[in-house]
């Protein structure tokens, strides 16, 4: 019999603790949780700026009305399926949504949103994210027990804020945590 209580973290933000391997992909990362069930979890990192790309070239938009390049930042969402692109965006845009959440965020993964963004008709706020982060059943729960992640309520202004390199430090401040208070030793007493 399993007496553990399952807490659904869909729509929450995971904040990596300093116990996550330094130099690893998840070091100082923030992940918006798309789905969390007893079967596993999926999320998108939103503070790993990779590059800036031209939407027209990246999505092979065949529209002659878009003359100038439309440069947008591109973020690494995680180590799974880098060939897949997702837009994490505000819900003022609601065409062909992949996922729609109650906290004013949505996810789209289609050519139409990239064209609408290029024409200035897209969502007010959006992040282009490639790849995602996934956990199999019980894996995220184990990582939470090992103090690898902190859980924070979603804040869309925080997600879409500029300066991705400062978001992790700002998340700790938001949670009232001073990074210096983390022990350099991993484990439990």
From Swiss-Prot:
SUPFAM superfamilies attached to this UniProt entry: VC0467-like
Membrane-spanning parts: none
Pfam families: DUF179
Family membership: Belongs to the UPF0301 (AlgH) family.
Protein name stated in the entry: UPF0301 protein A1I_00140
PANTHER family recorded: UNCHARACTERIZED PROTEIN YQGE, UPF0301 PROTEIN YQGE
Cellular component, GO annotation: cytosol
């Amino acid at each position: 019999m399993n007496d553990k209580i399952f807490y659904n973290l869909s729509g929450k933000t995971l904040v990596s603790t300093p116990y996550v391997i330094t130099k690893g992909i998840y070091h100082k990362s923030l992940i918006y949780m798309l789905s969390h069930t007893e079967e596993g979890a999926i999320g998108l990192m939103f503070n790993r700026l990779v590059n800036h790309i031209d939407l027209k070239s990246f999505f092979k938009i065949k529209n002659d009305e878009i003359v100038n390049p439309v440069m947008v930042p591109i973020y690494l969402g995680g180590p799974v399926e880098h060939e897949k692109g997702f837009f994490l965006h505000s819900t003022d845009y609601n065409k062909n949504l992949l996922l729609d959440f109650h906290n004013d965020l949505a996810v789209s993964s289609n050519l139409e949103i990239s064209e609408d963004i290029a024409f200035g008709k897209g969502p007010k706020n959006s992040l282009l994210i490639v790849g995602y982060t996934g956990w199999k059943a019980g894996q995220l729960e184990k990582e939470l027990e090992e103090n690898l992640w902190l859980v924070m309520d979603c804040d869309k202004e925080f997600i879409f804020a500029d300066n991705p390199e400062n978001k992790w430090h700002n998340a700790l401040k938001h949670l009232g945590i001073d990074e210096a208070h983390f022990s350099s030793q991993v484990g439990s007493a």
